[in-house]
């Protein structure tokens, strides 16, 4: 989808390493920072990205091994589970529906199409707001973010919560440790064993 979005600008992105940097941060940031687009061009590129992502790209992703079992184990343990993503909320829900996981979660919070909620900290703040509205005893002190890129760890730090990293994701274990994760687990089984 990133390649498709960049075609009109003559920007050709190849290889996994070059494309991986687009996973995690908001598209607006990525297109201006990594591709040198102006704010106006980035907005047009986001529209083009979504032209492909919504009908096609959303169905090309795969669930990491063990994620379903972890979500189910956390649910059985009574944990409140909220997905927070820099992707637009509607697309997050689409992906979760594809994997039949939407009903397993308590809330899904993503970026807004108008740019009001865009960065990880903005998404987290919206998640905190919703949790406080839904759960009288909600406390940030009992909240942890599980993530796979430094954007997750940075957002957690800025939001005043701990981040637990997973080493098999897009950032890798070293990135998560360097970003300040309080723990890093190499697979879902180890994560479940540590937290349930």
Identify the meaning behind each predicted range:
Residues 1-68, 77:
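N-terminal helical cap/lid subdomain that shapes the substrate entry/recognition surface
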Residues 24, 28, 64, 68, ...:
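Alpha-helix N-cap/helix-start and coil->helix boundary motif
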Residues 57-62, 86, 162-163:
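Short, flexible loop segments at the rims of nucleotide/cofactor-binding pockets, characterized by
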């Amino acid at each position: 989808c990133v390649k498709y979005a960049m075609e009109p600008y003559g920007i050709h992105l190849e290889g996994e390493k070059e494309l991986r940097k687009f996973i995690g941060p908001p598209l607006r940031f990525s297109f201006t920072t990594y591709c040198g687009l102006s704010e106006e061009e980035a907005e047009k590129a986001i529209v083009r990205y979504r032209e492909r992502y919504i009908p096609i790209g959303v169905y090309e992703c795969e669930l990491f091994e063990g994620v379903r079992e972890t979500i189910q184990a956390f649910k059985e343990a009574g944990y409140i589970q909220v997905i927070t993503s820099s992707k637009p909320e509607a697309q997050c829900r689409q992906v979760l529906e594809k994997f039949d996981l939407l009903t397993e979660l308590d809330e899904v919070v993503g970026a807004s199409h108008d740019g009001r909620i865009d960065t990880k900290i903005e998404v987290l703040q919206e998640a905190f707001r919703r949790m406080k509205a839904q759960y009288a005893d909600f406390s940030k002190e009992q909240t942890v973010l599980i993530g796979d890129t430094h954007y997750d760890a940075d957002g957690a730090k800025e939001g005043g919560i701990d981040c637990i990293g997973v080493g098999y994701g897009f950032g890798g274990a070293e990135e998560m440790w360097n970003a300040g994760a309080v723990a890093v687990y190499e697979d879902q089984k180890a994560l479940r064993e540590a937290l349930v």
